[in-house]
From Swiss-Prot:
Entry keyword set: Chloroplast, Plastid, Transit peptide
Organism: Arabidopsis thaliana
Name by which UniProt lists this protein: ATP-dependent Clp protease proteolytic subunit-related protein 3, chloroplastic
Assembly behavior: Component of the chloroplastic Clp protease core complex which consist of at least 16 proteins: CLPP4 (3 copies), CLPP5 (3 copies), CLPR4 (2 copies), ClpP1 (1 copy), CLPP6 (1 copy), CLPR2 (1 copy), CLPT1 (1 copy), CLPT2 (1 copy) and 3 copies of CLPP3 and/or CLPR1 and/or CLPR3. The core complex is organized in two heptameric rings, one containing CLPP3,4,5,6 in a 1:2:3:1 ratio and the other CLPP1 and CLPR1,2,3,4 in a 3:1:1:1:1 ratio.
Biased composition (Low complexity): 8-30
Domain of life: Eukaryota
C-alpha cells in the first residue's frame, strides 16, 4: 500500500532532476520550494480532470465565444471588471466583438498559483469564468455534471458569484418528447438552494419547463434574459407507457401530478405570484418573451444592447407636444 501511494505521489511530481520528494533537511529554503512545487503540480493535475457537461457545438453563444477564443485569445485574458453584466455576454455589444471586453473577476486564492496562459479549451474557459452553461435538455448526464460544477465552484470560493447560462428545453426535446425525469431539474434546483454563493442566472436562448424554474431560482436582482430569448412554463409530461399495466400507469400519473404541484409552488415562491395564478397559466404551455417574463417575475432585468439608455432619453409625448407648440384638446 505504501509503495502504491509513493508511486502515485511520484507521478504528480515535476520531472526534474533537481527535485526530490524528500528534500534534504539541511536546506529549509529548498524544502519550502519543493513543497510549493508539489502543491502546484497536485492542483494542476486535479483541476485537469474536472468533468464538464456536454456542449452543443451549434449553440450560437458558444460558437461566437469559440470563434473569439480561436482568433483573438488575448481579448479573453486580463479583462477589466464590470459587475453590471455577467461575464462574456459583452461579445454581443459591438461588431468588433469585445473590442473593450469586461474582466471576469476571479478568486485571489485560486489565482495565486495559476499559470497566466489561455484555458486549453472552451469548457475550461467557461469554468474558469465561474460559468455553468446548460445548453442541452436535462438528462441524467447533464444533471450530474452541472451539480458537480456547482459543488466545485462553491468549494473553490464560497464568496464569489456563480453564473448559470441557460439555453435548454428542460426535460423535453424541441418536439415535446420527454427525455428526462422531472427529478433532474429538481436535483439542480436543490443544489442551487444549498449554495452559499450568489447565483446569477441568464437566459441566452430558451428556458422551458424545469429550465425556467432554474432561471427564476437565481438570486433576486441577478436574474437576466437576452432581448429575444423565450421562457415557457408547462405541466410535466407523462412519459410513454408502452405495454405498462394500467395500475402502473395510474401510479405514474399520480407522480406527475405531485411533480406538477411542487413545480407550481416553487414558481410561485420565486416569481411572487400566487399558487392559483401559476396553476392557471400552466394549464396550457405559457410562453413569455423577455418583457413578459420580467412582468411575471421570472427575471429582473433584460440585457438590452443600450436600448434602455436610448429609451430613457426619449422625450415623453406630452413634453414633445409642448415643445412643438401643439395643444391637445380633450
Amino acid at each position: 500500500m505504501a509503495s502504491c501511494l509513493q508511486a502515485s505521489m511520484n507521478s504528480l511530481l515535476p520531472r526534474s532532476s533537481s527535485f526530490s520528494p524528500h528534500p534534504p533537511l539541511s536546506s529549509n529554503s529548498s524544502g519550502r520550494r519543493n513543497l510549493k512545487t508539489f502543491r502546484y503540480a497536485f492542483r494542476a493535475k486535479a483541476s485537469a480532470k474536472i468533468p464538464m457537461p456536454p456542449i452543443n457545438p451549434k449553440d450560437p453563444f458558444l460558437s461566437t465565444l469559440a470563434s473569439i477564443a480561436a482568433n483573438s485569445p488575448e481579448k479573453l485574458l486580463n479583462r477589466p471588471v464590470n459587475a453590471d453584466v455577467p461575464p462574456y455576454l459583452d461579445i454581443f455589444d459591438s461588431p468588433q466583438l469585445m473590442s473593450s471586453p469586461a474582466q471576469v473577476e476571479r478568486s485571489v486564492a485560486y489565482n495565486e498559483h495559476r499559470p497566466r496562459t489561455p484555458p486549453p479549451d472552451l469548457p475550461s474557459m467557461l469554468l474558469d469564468g465561474r460559468i455553468v452553461y446548460i445548453g442541452m435538455p436535462l438528462v441524467p448526464a447533464v444533471t450530474e455534471l452541472v451539480v458537480a460544477e456547482l459543488m466545485y465552484l462553491q468549494w473553490l470560493d464560497p464568496k464569489e458569484p456563480i453564473y448559470i447560462y441557460i439555453n435548454s428545453t428542460g426535460t423535453t426535446r424541441d418536439d415535446g418528447e420527454t427525455v428526462g425525469m422531472e427529478s433532474e431539474g429538481f436535483a439542480i434546483y436543490d443544489s442551487l438552494m444549498q449554495l452559499k454563493n450568489e447565483v446569477h442566472t441568464v437566459c441566452v436562448g430558451a428556458a422551458i419547463g424545469q429550465a425556467c424554474l432554474l432561471l427564476s431560482a437565481g438570486t433576486k436582482g441577478k436574474r437576466f434574459m437576452m432581448p429575444h430569448a423565450k421562457a415557457m412554463i408547462q405541466q410535466p409530461r407523462v412519459p410513454s407507457s408502452g405495454l405498462m399495466p394500467a395500475s402502473d400507469v395510474l401510479i405514474r400519473a399520480k407522480e406527475v401530478i405531485t411533480n406538477r404541484d411542487i413545480l407550481v409552488e416553487l414558481l410561485s415562491k420565486h416569481t411572487g405570484n400566487s399558487v392559483e395564478t401559476v396553476a392557471n397559466v400552466m394549464r396550457r404551455p405559457y410562453y413569455m418573451d423577455a418583457p413578459k417574463a420580467k412582468e411575471f417575475g421570472v427575471i429582473d432585468r433584460i440585457l438590452w444592447r443600450g436600448q434602455e439608455k436610448i429609451i430613457a432619453d426619449v422625450v415623453p409625448s406630452e413634453e414633445f407636444d409642448k415643445n412643438a407648440g401643439i395643444k391637445s384638446v380633450v
